């Protein structure tokens, strides 16, 4: 019944008043039909029917929040059934505090009963423990200093047992009724949480430890390289993995024991069919095999074990983003690899050198990533860098440390590393796209013409100050620079070390296109995905046709340049020039 409805005057008065300052519309058509219209001469005057309605409230059934956030109560009227209940705003019930308090008390009791029932359904033993603890705490609060001994102790113990048994008897029928309830008919949906471990690539061999126990710092400093001396570990199967998260009973879903050499093909198969994890991939050494044995029987909780002689080195926090969720990201230390749909993304992020400088370790990792991309289903490779610098060329500090030991032998090793690195770019059959996000210096700029498309950030700049370094050019720049920008501009860059802005490099042909810094990444990814949607055979054949007459010439130029570097680095004058350059850099800093 609404507030505008009239009630028989023979009803007994209740100690509840219903105040209304303005007319309250009633939506229920049945109430309007049954109500006697109230005649009000003045719109501001409350009708006698409304004034008399304060005696007609029987109880409050429910409450809610309206669109404006105000509380409304569902009122049960005397002489009417539940179909005639109406929602009334709280300000109309200011004198019905007795009914409101009664409703709130019943509402709170129902909530407590529901919470206790859920706890009992999950574990009845926990409920019994809870009632025992609460009873014990109540007794202890009564007289916390008194020691309960003798008959007093016995009587209180019996009291606790009686309370527990009474609770058990009362809760047993309700639990039985719940078990017999048809969940399908009741519309209740049971959501089973998905294990966060399921589908997540394991980056190292940890033994049955839940992810909540892992220290955040330790997780960030994980270095994924696993040596052949890695101890025997236990891997969890899908069933046991779910059991560890509490979503399923523990099931010993056995992973077949693998004893003896594990080849790369076997590890790939295990990873694909879902019965293996990435420790197989991580445990592969350079020769492609490693002895490892796995079993899920007798799994015990333990700490993560990291076996890496370089784990004491600081981990670059710039890598704490989604690339570390991919399996290939854990194979390298100085680069990050993302295997995406149709292409492979290689990012320079060196730990063993500063500003993404190149030393033999970084070069080997880039070569390994390119070899993997050449063999898989990637249509092209995107090469970029993490941070504000693309590549600062060779790591001269690394070279100086080794040249002081055995100059002739170390100079040969370093020249050979550069030769293999450059040849990898020359011989790579799939398109290589470079996204230059910052300065590209020395070898970092020389390899750009060996790639197929170069996109640059507006803030990037390019320089090859080889004479300042005290070395001869590298990266086939003696051939590619004159072909791209002409002899005069090439000599200006290679001899005098002229610095080119991104726009100047684009005008000379070293860069294909320049993008605004704010949208650089988005522009690159849009164009990469367009290229990745093309036919891979068309892409490879197109590159082969463009490079067919240059491959042998580039390999010969690379050989000549490395021989010159070997000669310079093996001489005392070359060492002095390099030391002078480093000293100038230190003074400038």
Curated annotation (Swiss-Prot):
Keywords per UniProt: Acyltransferase, Chromosome, Differentiation, Lyase, Methylation, Nucleus, Phosphoprotein, Repressor, Spermatogenesis, Transcription, Transcription regulation, Transferase
GO biological process: negative regulation of peptidyl-lysine crotonylation; random inactivation of X chromosome; spermatid development
Compositional bias ranges of the Basic and acidic residues kind: 11-30, 206-216
Gene Ontology molecular function terms on file: acyltransferase activity; chromatin binding; crotonyl-CoA hydratase activity; methylated histone binding; protein-macromolecule adaptor activity; transcription corepressor activity
Expressing tissues: Expressed in the brain, with expression in the hippocampal dentate gyrus, CA1, striatum and cortex (at protein level). Expressed in the prelimbic cortex.
Binding partners and assembly: Forms multimers and multimerization is required for stable binding to chromatin. Interacts with HDAC1 and HDAC2 via its C-terminal acetyl-CoA-binding domain. Interacts with EZH2, EED, SUZ12, REST, EHMT1 and EHMT2. Part of a complex containing at least CDYL, REST, WIZ, SETB1, EHMT1 and EHMT2. Part of a complex containing at least CDYL, MIER1, MIER2, HDAC1 and HDAC2. Interacts with CHAF1A and CHAF1B; bridging the CAF-1 complex to the MCM2-7 (MCM) complex. Interacts with MCM3 and MCM5; bridging the CAF-1 complex to the MCM2-7 (MCM) complex. Recruited to Xist RNA-coated X chromosome.
Region feature Interaction with EZH2, mapped onto this chain: 55-300
Catalytic activity field: 3-hydroxybutanoyl-CoA = (2E)-butenoyl-CoA + H2O
Residues modified as N6,N6-dimethyllysine: 129
Keyword tRNA processing part of the UniProt annotation: no
EC number: 4.2.1.-, 2.3.1.-
PROSITE patterns attached to this UniProt entry: CHROMO_1 (PS00598), CHROMO_2 (PS50013)
Comp. bias (Polar residues): 1-10, 132-143
Positions of post-translational N6-methyllysine modification: 129
Database matches in InterPro entries: Chromo-like_dom_sf, Chromo/chromo_shadow_dom, Chromo_domain, Chromodomain_CS, ClpP/crotonase-like_dom_sf, ECH/Chromodomain_protein, Enoyl-CoA_hydra/iso, Enoyl-CoA_hydra_C
Disulfide bonds: none
Residues covered by region (Disordered): 1-57, 110-155, 202-224
Residues where N6,N6,N6-trimethyllysine is found: 129
Gene: Cdyl
Name used for this protein in its record: Chromodomain Y-like protein
Location of the region described as Acetyl-CoA-binding domain in the Swiss-Prot/TrEMBL record: 353-585
Domain notes: The chromo domain recognizes and binds histone H3K9me3, histone H3K27me2 and histone H3K27me3.
Segments forming domain Chromo: 55-115
Organism taxonomic ancestry: Eukaryota, Metazoa, Chordata, Craniata, Vertebrata
Description of what induces expression: Down-regulated upon neuronal activity in response to an enriched environment, NMDA injection in the brain or seizures induced by kainic acid (at protein level). Up-regulated after social defeat stress.
């Amino acid at each position: 019944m609404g507030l505008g409805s009239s009630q028989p005057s023979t009803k007994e008065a209740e100690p509840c008043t219903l105040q209304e300052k303005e007319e309250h519309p009633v939506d229920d058509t049945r109430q309007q039909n049954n109500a006697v219209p109230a005649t009000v001469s003045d719109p501001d005057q409350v009708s006698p029917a409304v004034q008399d309605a304060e005696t007609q409230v029987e109880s409050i059934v429910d409450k809610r929040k309206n669109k404006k956030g105000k509380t409304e109560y569902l009122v049960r009227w005397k002489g009417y059934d539940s179909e005639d209940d109406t929602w009334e705003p709280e300000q109309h019930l200011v004198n019905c505090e007795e009914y409101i308090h009664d409703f709130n008390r019943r509402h709170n009791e129902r909530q407590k009963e529901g919470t206790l029932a859920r706890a009992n359904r999950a574990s009845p033993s926990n409920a019994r423990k809870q009632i025992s603890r609460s009873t014990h705490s109540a007794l202890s609060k009564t007289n916390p200093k008194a020691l309960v001994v003798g008959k007093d102790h016995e009587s209180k113990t019996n009291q606790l047992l009686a309370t527990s048994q009474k609770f058990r008897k009362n809760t047993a029928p309700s639990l039985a009724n719940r078990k017999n309830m048809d969940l399908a008919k009741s519309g209740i949906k049971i959501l089973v949480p998905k294990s966060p471990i399921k589908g997540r690539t394991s980056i190292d061999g940890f033994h049955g430890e839940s992810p909540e126990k892992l220290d955040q710092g330790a997780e960030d400093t994980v270095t994924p390289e696993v040596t052949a001396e890695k101890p025997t570990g236990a891997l969890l199967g899908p069933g046991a993995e779910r059991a560890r998260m509490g979503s399923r009973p523990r099931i010993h879903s056995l992973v077949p024991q693998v004893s003896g050499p594990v080849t790369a093909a076997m590890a790939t198969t295990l990873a694909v069919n879902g019965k293996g994890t990435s420790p197989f991939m991580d445990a592969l050494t350079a020769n492609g095999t490693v002895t490892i044995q796995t079993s899920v029987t007798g799994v015990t909780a333990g700490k993560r074990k990291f076996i890496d002689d370089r784990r004491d080195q600081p981990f670059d926090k710039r890598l704490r983003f989604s690339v570390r969720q991919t399996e290939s990201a854990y194979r390298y230390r100085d680069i990050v690899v993302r295997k995406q749909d149709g292409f492979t993304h290689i990012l320079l992020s060196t730990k063993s050198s500063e500003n993404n400088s190149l030393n033999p370790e970084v070069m080997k990792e880039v070569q390994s990533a390119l070899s993997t991309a050449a063999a898989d289903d990637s249509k092209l490779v995107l090469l970029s860098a993490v941070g504000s610098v693309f590549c600062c060329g060779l790591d001269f500090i690394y070279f100086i440390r080794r040249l002081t030991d055995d100059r002739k032998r170390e100079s040969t090793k370093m020249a050979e590393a550069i030769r293999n690195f450059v040849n990898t770019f020359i011989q790579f059959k799939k398109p290589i796209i470079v996204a230059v996000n910052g300065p590209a210096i020395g070898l970092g700029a020389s390899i750009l013409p060996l790639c197929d498309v170069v996109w640059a950030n507006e803030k990037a700049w390019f320089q090859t100050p080889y004479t300042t370094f005290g070395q001869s050019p590298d990266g086939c720049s003696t051939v590619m620079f004159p072909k791209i920008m002409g002899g005069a501009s090439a000599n200006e860059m290679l001899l005098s070390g002229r610095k080119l802005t991104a726009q100047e490099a684009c005008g000379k042909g070293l860069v294909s296109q320049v993008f605004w810094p704010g949208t650089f990444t988005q522009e690159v990814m849009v164009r990469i995905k367009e290229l990745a949607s093309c036919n891979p055979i068309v892409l490879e054949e197109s590159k082969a046709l463009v490079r067919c007459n240059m491959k042998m010439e580039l390999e010969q130029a690379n050989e000549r340049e490395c021989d010159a570097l070997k000669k310079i680095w093996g001489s005392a004058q070359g060492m002095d020039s390099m030391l002078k350059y480093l000293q100038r850099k230190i003074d400038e800093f």
